[in-house]
A protein has these predicted regions:
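Accessory cap/linker subdomain of secreted extracellular hydrolases
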Residues: 138-141, 145-152, 157, 223-350
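C-terminal, loop-rich substrate-recognition/catalytic regions characterized by aromatic stacking residues
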Residues: 420-722
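N-terminal cap/lid segment of alpha/beta-hydrolase-fold proteins
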Residues: 68-112, 550-552
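Cap/lid segment of the alpha/beta-hydrolase catalytic domain
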Residues: 108-197, 417-423, 663
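Catalytic His-Asp charge-relay segment
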Residues: 352-359
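Conserved alpha/beta-hydrolase "acid-adjacent" motif
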Residues: 364-371
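An N-terminal hydrophobic leader/cap segment in hydrolases
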Residues: 40-88
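A catalytic-pocket lid/entrance helix-loop region that shapes and gates access to the active site
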Residues: 184, 209-293, 359-364, 380-388, ...
Length: 746
């Protein structure tokens, strides 16, 4: 081994090394500061824009399906190899409807046949693309269909034909609409289905799909009773258009109505919608494309058809003075009942069509509508509700397993997950997968073994806080019972009758928060999901607030009912009530917690609409079942909260906040609005709230089935125990661990 000579370092070298070391430390420090600054800035930006870190969607993550994985169906064809055709199909009266067909190239070339999915829309079957974006389309025709592209590719790949139709008086079709959802659409739908069955690629079986208000159009197809129509999938369809969309509780949903009318007015006239609520779609509409796509190069014909659309009535104008279901539209001469699909429920039930309806808890009143449709089809309606609807035909198949109902924590048409407890607020549920399963079951006999729909109960509903999917055969689920609480002094809600008293508030006619609510369906479609601050303490300033004591672990599933005795100093009022979860408990370790006040659900009502009888909780919203509200007189009003499934954790409290619906979403009830609202309780005015509930958390219907030890842990929560032991923050105790209380009185 040779010893190395020691290095000789002069002063200059030492100085350079010292400087380099100093510079390295400086750069490292600067880099560290930059990284920290960038991280803080990014986090701050994400916070203020609502952006959160994505999560991996596995079983039991957010709203992910009870299956826990994607349903793939059977993939036969490459979506790039799709035969696309657009053409006019003439109706019997000579009116041309624009029809697009998508079929796998292989099916066309080999003269094979497949079932068809029909999509009838008044929002445009396709849109133009501006140069240079027109260079990058999948098809020879230069257009895009962003609202349905995922569905088209999925179903064509899986062995279906897809047919999109601009309904009469819209898109590129000819004619005009007497009004939305007129009976003419039923006749047109029958003819389109008949045309489909005669195409060389059709095997004679048809399904239909409809999202949002297009779902009402899909139900009109069922009302045609064409024998080829086998199944329909609805997502966010307000079946009761009056109560679930435009007049919840008889209160005009002004914002949704105006947005819908503005959108349809522009698209009917080949105008790119001018009121798009978010920046990205607005830029895309202005610079990428967005006009309705024409069928052919006949410009004169296209302009003529667009001109015919100007005869379509404007829904906002037509409903300007409308208050009751049986009021007539301003110029059309029909009542609102003739817009509502409820008038055709009998024909839909006797058509034999199987229907899968998705309803979002935070999508206007759509969950209630979806439940109503399922209950009607299965003959399980409350007798008072059934009396207001067409009689169920004797030939209707009322087997609940013939239909499906899925209720989840979604905004309008399932666009977003609005569960306040969802990790990263990320949607993990793929509606297209469940729709695919449903259609595979009904349209392909040999796919039933893959779809496995027959192995499941027909109802699936998601329980917020518990974050589990559950199943049932009837609605409401059989394990629930009603629990009544009474309002009383000191803004308390008690289990027993209370002394008489009253609480008055000064009415604030201003929006509570500058955030999105459940009622603006068009904004939901552009990714603005309903958002409610978790700490709603400031509501006390303008709402009458009542609160329960600490409660044991409780599941609430269904429609909460508020029987309210009130008076106002002016005759016109729209009432609103919020149900809230109050949590000021110490957190458990790893608890998914929202400390403060969390929104559960809400109810609105114009109290001129009384119940159909004194002991009923059902309103008809007809003129004959109305009353005049006089100043300073006490009235009883029944407010039905929008359906929800929610778990109230151990020692949480329920709060009810009552006030006047603000004009941000709703129109005023009249010219003279109240300045003072009084809530009366106790004695002859027993204001109360009725909860469809279960003491503890019901585990037997959780899907997939939980392990026995987990079920035992949950079931133990309903059992009374002897001592009180408040869990300290940071302990290992499960947030749903057995509730320890001196006595479980509920």
């Amino acid at each position: 081994m040779v010893d190395e000579a020691p290095e000789v370092v002069d002063a200059a070298t030492t100085e350079r090394r010292a400087a380099a070391s100093s510079n390295a430390k400086h750069y490292m420090k600067s880099a560290f500061i930059s990284m920290v600054t960038l991280t803080v800035a990014t986090k701050a930006t994400d916070y203020f824009t609502g952006k959160e870190e994505p999560v991996s969607c596995g079983l039991d993550v957010n709203d992910n399906s009870w299956i826990g994985k994607r349903y793939e169906s059977l993939r036969y064809f490459n979506p790039k190899d799709t035969h696309y055709n657009t053409q006019y199909v003439a109706m019997k009266d000579g009116v041309d409807l624009a029809v697009d067909t998508y079929v796998a190239d292989y099916i066309v070339k080999k003269n094979q046949t497949v079932p068809t999915i029909l999509y009838a829309t008044r929002h445009g079957r396709g849109y133009t693309l501006d140069f240079p974006f027109s260079l990058f389309t999948q098809y020879e025709k230069k257009f895009t269909n962003p609202r349905t592209n995922v569905y088209v590719n999925r179903f064509v790949t899986n062995g279906y034909a897809w047919v999109a139709v601009d309904v009469r008086g819209t898109g590129a079709s000819a004619g005009s609409k007497k009004h939305d959802f007129a009976d003419q659409e039923i006749e047109d739908g029958y003819e389109i289905i008949e045309w489909i069955t005669k195409q060389p690629w059709s095997n004679g079986n048809v399904a239909a799909i409809g999202h949002g208000l297009e779902g009402v159009g899909a139900l009109l197809l069922a009302a045609s009773k064409h024998p080829a129509l086998k199944a329909i999938s609805l997502n966010g369809a307000p079946v009761d258009l009056y109560r679930s969309a435009f007049y919840p509780g008889g209160v005009k949903n002004r914002k949704a109505l105006e947005s819908y009318s503005s959108f349809t007015y522009d698209t009917d006239r080949q105008i790119r919608w001018r009121e798009i609520p978010t920046l990205k779609p607005r830029i895309m509409m202005n610079y990428f494309g967005g006009n309705i796509y024409p069928v052919d190069d006949n410009v004169a014909k296209f302009k003529n058809y667009i001109a015919q659309h100007t005869n379509n009535p404007n829904l906002t104008n037509e409903l300007l003075d409308l208050k009751f279901r049986d009021d007539k539209l301003k110029s059309v001469g029909v009542t609102f009942e003739e817009l509502d699909i409820l008038r055709h429920l009998g024909d839909i039930a006797s058509s034999g069509v199987s229907i899968h309806s998705f309803g979002g808890y935070y999508d206007m009143g759509v969950a209630r509508s979806s439940i109503l449709l399922f209950q009607y089809l299965t003959n399980t309606l409350d007798k008072d509700v059934a009396a207001l609807l067409p009689k169920l035909p004797e030939d209707a198949n009322t087997d609940p397993f013939n239909h499906r109902l899925t209720l989840g924590p979604w905004s309008h048409a399932g666009v977003d997950n609005s569960d306040p407890f969802a990790t990263s607020k990320q949607k993990c549920f793929y509606h297209v997968d469940e729709i695919s399963r449903f259609f595979d079951h009904h349209m392909y006999e040999n796919r039933k073994k893959f779809a496995k729909v027959e192995e499941e109960e027909p109802i699936h509903y998601y329980t917020v806080v518990h974050s589990k999917w559950k199943s049932a055969v009837t609605w409401p689920p059989a394990h629930l019972s009603d629990q009544v609480f009474y309002f009383g002094p000191n803004q308390a809600i008690e289990e027993v009758a209370t002394p008489s008293g009253e609480l008055s508030i000064d009415v604030a006619h201003k929006p509570l928060y500058d955030v999105e609510s459940r009622w603006n369906m068009i904004n939901h479609l552009f990714g603005i999901r309903p958002f409610y601050y978790n700490d709603r303490q400031q509501m006390e300033e303008q709402y009458a607030v009542f609160q329960t004591p600490e409660l044991p672990l409780t599941e609430i599933t269904g429609e909460v009912e508020l029987r309210l005795f009130f008076s106002v100093d002016k005759p016109n009022v729209n009432l609103v009530a919020f149900l809230e979860d109050v949590d000021y408990q110490l957190p458990f370790k790893n608890e998914n917690k929202r400390r403060g006040m969390t929104y559960i659900t809400e109810a609105v009502l114009n109290p001129v609409h009384k119940t159909i009888s004194k002991d009923s909780s059902v309103q008809s919203f007809l003129k004959k079942d109305s009353r005049e509200i006089k100043a300073n007189e006490v009235y009883e009003a029944v407010l039905k909260f929008e359906p929800i499934s929610y778990v109230l954790k151990h020692k949480h409290q329920l709060r009810v906040s009552i006030g006047v619906a603000t004009p941000k979403e709703f129109g005023n009830a009249g010219e003279e609005v109240p300045a003072k609202l009084t809530i009366h309780y106790g004695g002859e005015y027993p204001t109360s709230i009725k909860l469809p509930s279960f003491s503890g958390v019901f585990m037997e219907n959780v899907v997939p089935k939980v392990a026995d030890e987990a079920a035992d842990a949950f079931e133990a929560q309903a059992e009374p125990v002897e001592t009180v032991t408040a869990p300290a923050a940071g302990t290992e105790e499960d947030e749903f661990a057995a509730a320890e209380d001196e006595k479980d009185e509920l």
